[in-house]
Amino acid sequence: MNTIISPKEIALYIDHTLLKPEASPAAIRTLCAEAREYSFKTVCVNSCYVPLCVEELQACPVDVCSVVGFPLGAMLSSAKAYEAKLAVAAGADEIDMVINIGLLKAGELEAVRADIETVFAACGEADLKVIIETGLLSDAEKKSVCQICKEVGVAFVKTSTGFGHGGATVADVELMRAVVGERCKVKASGGVRNLADARALIAAGANRIGASAGIAIVNGEEVPPSR
């Protein structure tokens, strides 16, 4: 991939993200205004804010992405599916679900598959991205869950929530891309704070960047790590 992709082109890769528990309606409106101004691919928000984002982004090419089962993934699959169904009904174009990490760590791969399939079925025409939380997984576990995602046929595999240990790395994106090939896209999320990071992840195979630092990225600036 082109490692000298321009900042303007980078904007089309970015899910402009605000998932903090203290995020207010006013902050979500600002997020949407920024996404319109910079032509980001989507805004990524908690499901309660999907209707507001749909309202704010009317007649605008920016899509709405909702997280589901976020950030732990440790809820009933039926509850994740219901949240996804409601978000899609409210206008979400994309769903980012968190897998049941504990089941994957326990080697219960069929249960992990069932969890993903249940949410996938609830998404209808919306694209499903599956967050695997790479910072908590061995390489073997990353490969196993990416293979499941490939077989189920989800739209994306995604590195991280940004709430757990670690974030997106070039090595993880390369590993995920090697497993899914062209069958799924790859979203790199977690700790992407500058243009160089974004370019490196795209060069490694990422099709999408999840970041709260989208404006800094396209402006060639850097956001310091959160504390």
From Swiss-Prot:
Its EC number is 4.1.2.4. It comes from the Bacteria. One of its GO terms (cellular component) is cytoplasm. Keywords: Cytoplasm, Lyase, Schiff base. Belongs to the DeoC/FbaB aldolase family. DeoC type 1 subfamily. This is Deoxyribose-phosphate aldolase. Pfam families: DeoC. It comes from Desulfotalea psychrophila (strain LSv54 / DSM 12343). Transmembrane segments: none annotated. InterPro entries: Aldolase_TIM, DeoC, DeoC/FbaB/LacD_aldolase, DeoC_typeI. It catalyses: 2-deoxy-D-ribose 5-phosphate = D-glyceraldehyde 3-phosphate + acetaldehyde. The active site is at 96 (proton donor/acceptor), 158 (schiff-base intermediate with acetaldehyde), 187 (proton donor/acceptor). Catalyzes a reversible aldol reaction between acetaldehyde and D-glyceraldehyde 3-phosphate to generate 2-deoxy-D-ribose 5-phosphate. The lineage of its organism: Bacteria, Pseudomonadati, Thermodesulfobacteriota, Desulfobulbia, Desulfobulbales. The gene is deoC. GO terms for biological process: 2-deoxyribose 1-phosphate catabolic process; carbohydrate catabolic process; deoxyribonucleotide catabolic process. One of its GO terms (molecular function) is deoxyribose-phosphate aldolase activity.
